[in-house]
């Protein structure tokens, strides 16, 4: 499971505000309290029942606005998410964001469900039981569906075949980012016009 869900914490501890980024996707779910998230130059105030979605290498900072600030913090491997949900638009909130994307989603009436999902994720993460990865995938899928229902505009519309090919290229880049890659080389590898990649 730790290849998909690389870290999961439930916390009420305060942390100093500092700008940072991760090599992984990040989900922060606010259970109680309020915090200000600054992500890619946009400020959001997240209260109880808000889910904050942050992509790899997306610079952000967090400052608690009210106590207790209780939250769940999960980091997720984007390549593993892609493997877990290979044909799903649900992971688009971390990859292919439409214009007007909002990092902070209020789950509104689904807060009790979201609380329960994160409580179960924490138990699965800590217990290392057989089938833990499959359970984590199912719970993450539920959370992303709740997010979709609360804010469908955050998810890209259906993709054309050429856009699907670009998605494959994007996944390849994410998995091979330490290697030297060129647009021309990628276009040849995936039999696609270089203009689709620029």
Annotated model-derived regions:
Residues 1-11, 59-126, 144-153:
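A hydrophobic/aromatic-rich effector-binding and dimerization subdomain
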Residues 36-38, 54, 60-66:
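Short beta-strand His + acidic residue motifs that chelate non-heme Fe in jelly-roll/DSBH
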Residues 109, 125-142, 160:
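All-alpha amphipathic helical-bundle segments outside canonical DNA-binding/catalytic cores
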Residues 146, 152, 168, 172-198:
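Basic/polar phosphate-binding segments, predominantly the helix-turn-helix DNA-binding elements
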């Amino acid at each position: 499971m730790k290849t998909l869900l690389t870290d999961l914490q439930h916390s009420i501890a305060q942390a100093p505000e500092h700008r940072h980024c991760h090599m992984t996707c990040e989900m922060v779910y606010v259970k109680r309290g309020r915090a200000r998230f600054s992500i890619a130059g946009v400020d959001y105030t997240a209260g109880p029942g808000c889910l904050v979605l942050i992509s790899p290498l997306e610079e952000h900072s967090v400052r608690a606005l009210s106590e207790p600030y209780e939250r769940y913090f999960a980091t997720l491997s984007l390549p593993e998410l892609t493997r877990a949900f290979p044909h799903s638009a649900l992971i688009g909130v971390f990859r292919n964001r439409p214009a007007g994307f909002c990092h902070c989603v209020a789950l509104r009436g689904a807060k009790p469900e979201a609380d329960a999902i994160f409580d179960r994720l924490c138990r699965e993460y800590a217990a290392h039981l057989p089938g833990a990865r499959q359970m984590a995938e199912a719970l993450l899928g539920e959370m992303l569906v709740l997010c979709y229902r609360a804010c469908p505009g955050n998810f890209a519309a259906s993709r054309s075949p050429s856009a699907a090919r670009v998605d494959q290229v994007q996944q390849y880049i994410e998995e091979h980012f330490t290697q030297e890659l060129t647009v021309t080389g990628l276009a040849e590898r995936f039999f696609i016009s270089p203009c689709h990649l620029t």
